């Protein structure tokens, strides 16, 4: 019995360690670390790459994509930066913004369907901002070539609007640039009803000699966003190299010492991802390209994911056409899956961090999404998905609780052995093993079903944590955002007392419900005789209550509901096996005064 309990204690402690690590993301030191990092970066002085003298804003074919369009620190406001450049408006059902004609850059994108808070009157999410602002974030596609080509479009090229006055779902726009040798570069930009921009480039060579050039693309972000130090989700650089290639994930800190270069391949994509939003470029899929992730220092530190293609040649009097894609928006699962199929983008669904248990996590989301679409409430979808998972694992749970019932049935004999052998632990263990053998009981049989359920638990946890569908999704009553902590607090009587409480005392209704259900679940079993184990057994629900209070309400509701189902499941199975349910007896035992042993 003691060995079996030790397994459960080990599992519980492992979960505590994991959750304690996640809990650190609420620590105010995160902001201090961010400020310290910005100060460190601002002190570094490194000369940044500039366009070659005499060449229209490109570089040589052997050069790398541009690192930055300016050495100056970003001081302009977003409105000022937008107002001082020529632009073409973007207006769709999903996106508002504009294209900067300097560099044909996408640096002004706001997401109409998402607000900063649950209040619909709050500002909509700003994804992209111009490079000369503090939060500059943009994508850009251009060319690099030898100077004799006559110049190619790059970061400082001012394109001309040839057709269309506004980019919408039904009206593309065409930009053109003609260099000093008469080579014509044209770019037609179209957009779907969501977040995918299609770029069709054409290069016409009317001259008497062939020209050679390469293409580049980059996603550049000023500074480093504040990222909670949790292992649950990846935020930073990511990409797939090759049509059947593997995913590359790099954190911002991974590239601060030196750039990370991915081997040249044909096909794939690259970009930068946040928890809910992403910016990604899909280069032309027929030409090999090299991918690089880097940190650019100087007065304006920035992080960049870029690619550079192999050199391509356009003969005299000929032309070439290239097609690229830019994704800039919300990581909606059905939409990302559709883009992977519709545009043949390899492994584009990995834009969403499904984790190690992809084969469990994604089907779990599809089930939850089915319930969400049917009932229209993501909280209800969480509850129903948990029921289905519990039902699927009922046979395993039955074995687990049957083993526990058998152990309870053996409890009187165990007590007799304990009284017989006293403090002789070696003799006690030998007698226990003999008893297990006689009763044909495996003391660890109840642990394996639990261990098999752990990946499913983490998969469900992952779905709830990472998917944008839970963001600002209401439940019932006071829960208006399942992705935010329960806003109530026990320490001001859930809002009845007119004062705010410190963050660490924000113990809301749902964390309390979770703590109570966890307490009841643990009291379905007798308190361990070992004092240390008994103390852990007693305090764990309280510790979890405080820890999970700062977690998204959707996760806490899931945990409370899962505990409730587990209690019902355990009671049913133990009753079927003739084991006494000692929940209330165990609770009463907490308050009994233990007799003082005479010396």
UniProtKB/Swiss-Prot annotation:
GO molecular function annotation: membrane insertase activity
One BP annotation, GO: protein insertion into membrane
Location of the region described as Disordered in the Swiss-Prot/TrEMBL record: 35-78
Keyword Cell inner membrane part of the UniProt annotation: yes
A Pfam family: 60KD_IMP
Transmembrane intervals: 6-26, 378-398, 448-468, 501-521, 536-556
Membrane-topology descriptor: Multi-pass membrane protein
InterPro entries listed in its UniProt record: Membr_insert_YidC, Membr_insert_YidC_N, YidC/ALB3/OXA1/COX18, YidC/Oxa/ALB_C, YidC_ALB_C, YidC_periplasmic_sf
Subcellular location: Cell inner membrane
Assigned GO CC terms: plasma membrane
Keywords, ordered alphabetically: Cell inner membrane, Cell membrane, Chaperone, Membrane, Protein transport, Transmembrane, Transmembrane helix, Transport
CDD domains recorded: 5TM_YidC_Alb3, EcYidC-like_peri
Family: Belongs to the OXA1/ALB3/YidC family. Type 1 subfamily.
UniProt function note: Required for the insertion and/or proper folding and/or complex formation of integral membrane proteins into the membrane. Involved in integration of membrane proteins that insert both dependently and independently of the Sec translocase complex, as well as at least some lipoproteins. Aids folding of multispanning membrane proteins.
Subunit comment: Interacts with the Sec translocase complex via SecD. Specifically interacts with transmembrane segments of nascent integral membrane proteins during membrane integration.
Identification of the protein by name: Membrane protein insertase YidC
Source species of the chain: Agrobacterium fabrum (strain C58 / ATCC 33970)
């Amino acid at each position: 019995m003691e060995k079996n309990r030790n397994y459960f204690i080990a599992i519980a402690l492992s979960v505590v360690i994991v959750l304690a690590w996640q809990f650190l993301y609420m620590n105010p030191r995160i902001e201090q670390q961010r400020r310290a990092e910005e100060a460190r970066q601002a002190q570094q002085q490194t000369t940044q790459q500039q366009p070659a003298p005499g060449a229209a804003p490109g570089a040589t074919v052997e050069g790398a994509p541009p690192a930055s369009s300016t050495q100056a620190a970003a001081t302009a406001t977003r409105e000022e930066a937008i107002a001082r450049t020529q632009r073409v408006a973007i207006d769709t059902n999903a996106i508002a913004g504009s294209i900067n004609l300097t560099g044909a850059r996408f640096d002004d994108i706001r997401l109409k369907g998402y607000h900063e808070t649950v209040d619909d009157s709050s500002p909509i999410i700003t994804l992209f901002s111009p490079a000369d602002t503090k939060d500059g974030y943009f994508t850009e596609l251009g060319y690099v070539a030898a100077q004799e080509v006559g110049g190619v479009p790059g970061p400082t090229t001012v394109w001309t609007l040839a057709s269309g006055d506004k980019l919408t779902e039904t009206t593309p726009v065409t930009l053109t640039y003609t260099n000093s040798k008469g080579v014509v570069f044209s770019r037609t930009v179209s957009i779907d009803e969501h977040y995918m921009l299609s770029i069709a480039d054409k290069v016409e060579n009317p001259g008497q000699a062939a020209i050679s050039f390469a293409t580049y693309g980059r996603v550049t972000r000023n500074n480093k966003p504040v990222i909670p130090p949790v292992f649950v989700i990846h935020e930073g650089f990511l990409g797939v190299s090759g049509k059947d290639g593997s995913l590359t994930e790099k954190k911002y800190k991974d590239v601060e010492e030196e750039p990370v270069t991915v081997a040249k391949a044909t096909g794939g994509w690259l970009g930068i991802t946040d928890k809910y939003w992403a910016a990604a470029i899909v280069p032309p899929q027929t030409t090999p390209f090299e991918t690089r992730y880097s940190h650019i220092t100087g007065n304006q530190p920035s992080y960049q994911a870029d690619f550079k293609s192999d050199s391509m040649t356009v003969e005299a009097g000929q032309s070439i056409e290239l097609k690229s894609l830019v994704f800039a928006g919300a990581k909606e699962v059905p939409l990302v899956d559709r883009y992977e199929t519709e545009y043949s983008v390899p492994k584009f669904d990995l834009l969403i961090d499904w984790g190690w248990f992809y084969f469990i996590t994604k089907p779990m989301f599809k089930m939850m999404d089915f319930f969400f679409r049917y009932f229209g409430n993501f909280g209800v979808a969480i509850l129903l998905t948990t029921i289905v998972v519990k039902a699927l694992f009922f046979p395993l749970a039955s074995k687990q609780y049957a083993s526990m019932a058998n152990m309870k049935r053996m409890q009187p004999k165990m007590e007799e052995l304990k009284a017989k052998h006293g403090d002789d632990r070696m003799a006690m263990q030998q007698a226990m093993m003999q008893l297990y053998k006689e009763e044909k009981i495996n003391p660890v049989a109840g642990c394996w079903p639990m261990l098999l359920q752990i990946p499913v638990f983490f998969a469900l946890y992952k779905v709830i944590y990472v998917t944008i569908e839970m963001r600002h999704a209401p439940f019932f009553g006071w829960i208006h955002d399942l992705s935010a902590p329960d806003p109530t607090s026990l320490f001001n009587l859930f809002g009845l007392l007119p004062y705010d409480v410190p963050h660490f005392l924000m113990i809301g209704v749902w964390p309390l419900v979770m703590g109570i259900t966890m307490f009841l679940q643990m009291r379905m079993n007798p308190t361990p005789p070992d004092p240390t184990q008994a103390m852990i057994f007693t305090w764990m629900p309280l510790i979890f209550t405080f820890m999970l209070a700062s977690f998204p309400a959707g996760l806490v509701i899931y945990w409370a509901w899962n505990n409730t189902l587990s209690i019902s499941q355990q009671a049913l199975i133990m009753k079927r096996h003739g084991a006494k349910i000692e929940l209330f007896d165990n609770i009463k035992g907490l308050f009994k005064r233990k007799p003082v042993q005479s010396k």
